[in-house]
Amino acid sequence: MKRTVFIFVFLCAAFLLGAQSHISTQPHQEAVSVITPAAQESDFSKAYVSAGKDGFLIKWTEDNQGEHYQISEYEIKAAAVSPDGRFIAVYETDGGLVNRLALWDWETLSRKWARRYKDSVTSLSFTENGTYIIAGTATVSGAEFIRTATGDVAVGKIKDATGIVSYAVTNSTEKTAAMYSPAGNLSFYDLTTGRAKQRISVMQGLSQAVLFNNFLFLAGVKDDTLYVVYCISGKTITSIRTSNPILLASKSDRNLYYLENDGKGLYTLKMLENADNRTVSNPKIVRMFKGPRGNEAITSGAKLGNEIMLGSASGAVYKITADADSALSSIEPITQDIYDRILDMAPIGEDFYFLTKDSLFRSSYDTGIVKRLGDNPGRTQLITYGDSVILWSKDTRLPILLFDYSLPEVKTLYIPKTSLHSLRLFGNLLVDLESSSSVNVYDIEKGALREAYSGAGLQDCVIAADSKLYVAKSFATNPRCALLAVDLETGETVPTALAGNVAFGLSVRENDIYGVSVQENAGTKRTSVFRYNTAAKQTVSVANFTGEFPDAFTYLYFPSLYTNIGQNVGQNTIRAINLTDRKNIIFNRSASMPIKAACNAARAVILNRDGSISWYDGTSSQVLADWYLTKEGQWFEF
C-alpha cells in the first residue's frame, strides 16, 4: 500500500554547533531515572527536568510540552538543575567502568565540561546560588565541590573527609553545607573554613535522604520503613511502615509528602505535617488514585510548590497536585507515544528501506511516499539483496531470513550456531561473526554454510576484491595482530602489519579496507581511521583522534567515508571524510544521538538512537529534515 507522506511540522529549537532539540509529548523510551525541578518555588511558572535510562534529558514546561535532547548513550542516574534553570548537571553510568559527571548548558545544548570517576557518584546537587556542584562519591574522601563555571574541584572547600555522601545541600548564603552519609552521620560544614561544625549520629543506611522544614528534619527510607529524624538531637521521632515510597520534599517544605504504591496499581499520596518544629503528625492521606503497575509503575518524582511530577518504569510522565481529594481517581500520563521506532535502514535504488518492530517500509526524502512492503517477522536488522531483503537480529540465534516482498515469501537461510554479533553481504556470500569467536560464510545460491575462521577477541570481518576474508580482532589474542587475512579456499591465515591494540568497524571497496584501530602508548589512547590496501599490503592513516571510541563505526559511500569518531565534545556527531581531498563535513545532529549512516546517489540519511532519521544532501552539514514514523505509517517532520 502506497501512502503519500503527511508531514506535520513541529516546533524545534536550533542552537550553537547546529544542535537542536525537539518539543513534543513523547515519553522516555526507557525508565525515568530521576525528576528534578527546573524552577524555583517562587517562580510563576513550573518546570521540571526528567532524565532516563535512554540518555535523554527532557525539560517539561507548564503546558506539558517536553523539550527533548539526548546527551548520553548511557543511563542518566542523577541530575540537578542550576538555580537559574540554565545549566543541568548529570551523572552518566553504564553501571560499571563508565562514571561520568557533566555539565550541560541547556540554552545552547552544549556540554561545558565533563569529569570521569573510578567509583560511582552517590549524590548530585547545586549549591544554593549555583556557584558549585556538590558531587558525592563512593570513596572515603567523599564529596567534592566543583566550580560550575570551570569544572575544577575547589580544593580545600571541605578539608575533612566526608566519607560516602548520598545527600548534600547548602544554606542560602552558601556558607554552610549539610550532608548525610549512609554510615549514619548528618554533618554540617562551615564552607568558609572547610571544617565540620557539627556531626550528629543518625539512622544508618537511609535511601532517598532529604532535609525539610529548613534543616530541622531529616527523612529517609530503609527496609520499607520511613524514618524522620530531628536534626538538633539526632533522635528518630517517627518510623512508619510503608510500601514502595517515593519521598517528595525539599529543604524549604514545612511538611513531608510521600507517595505509596501497593504494587497493585493503587497509589496513595500521604503527608507528615510539621506540628511544632519538633515533631510531625501521623500520616495523613491527601489523595488516592489508580495508576500504572508492574513494569510500568511509577518510580520517581519531584514536588514543586503544590505540583508533583512523576516518572515511570516505562518512560511515561505524569502530573498531579498535592490538593486534598477524598475521591478515588485514575491518572493518565501527560506523555503520548505516537512514533514507530525505526530499527534499521538500507539503501535500495533511489529509495531506502526502513524496518520497524512490526513492518518493513520503503520511502525517500524526495518523493515523500511511504510504501509498506509487509510484516516484520520479529527481526531488528536488514540487508538489501537484489529486490529482496535479508532480515536478522543482533545478539540472538534467531534464523536468518530472506524476505521476497514481491510474492510475498519468507525463506529461512540458516540458523546461527551461537549469538550473532554481525552479518555482512558480499555478492552472494553472507559472512557472520558469532560470539566474537567464529566467522562463518553462507553461500546464498548454493545454500551452503561453513566455518571460515575461529579464534578469540574477534571484532568484525569483510571480504575484499582478492576474495580473501579479513578479520579485525584484538591484538592480545593469537595470532598477535589486529587484522588478519584468511584464504577462503585453503584456510591459510596471514597476519597483516596493521598497528593497534584492536581493530573494528570495517568497510571495504575493492582492495581497500577501511576501519578503526585503537592504540595505547604510555597510558594514552589514540584512535585512528585507517586504509589497508590488500594488494600493496600497506596501511595509510586517514584520520587520527585522541581518546578511545569503542562504539565507532565506518560506512563507505565513495568518495566519502562516514564515521562517528572525533566527535565534537559532548555532541556525538557523524562526519564524512572525503577520501580524495581529506576534507571533512561534520553533520549537525538531531535531538537524538546518531548510530548509523546510509547513502544513495541523492541523499545521506542518519538513523538516530530514538528511532528517528535525519536527512542530508551529503555535501552540507545542515539537516534537511528530521523525520519520525508514526504508528499509522506517516512521517512527522521536525
Regions picked out by a protein language model, each given a short descriptive name:
Residues E75-A80, D119-S125, T162-V169, Q204-L211, ...:
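Repeated scaffold domains used in trafficking and secretory/extracellular systems
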Residues F6, Q20-I35, A47, G55, ...:
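Eukaryotic protein-protein interaction scaffolds centered on beta-propeller repeats
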Residues Y48-A51, A89-D94, I134-T137, A178-Y180, ...:
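Conserved beta-strand element within WD40/beta-propeller blades
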Residues T61-N64, D105-L109, T148-G151, D190-G194, ...:
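Short loop/turn segments that connect beta-strands within beta-propeller blades
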Residues S45-K46, D84-R86, N129-T131, T173-K175, ...:
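Short coil/turn segments that connect the beta-strands within blades of beta-propeller domains
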Residues G96-L101, S141-F145, N185-S187, D224-V228, ...:
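Structural motif
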Residues S21-T25, Q65-Q70, S110-R115, V153-K159, ...:
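A short beta-strand motif characteristic of beta-propeller blades
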Residues I7-F15:
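Bacterial N-terminal signal peptides
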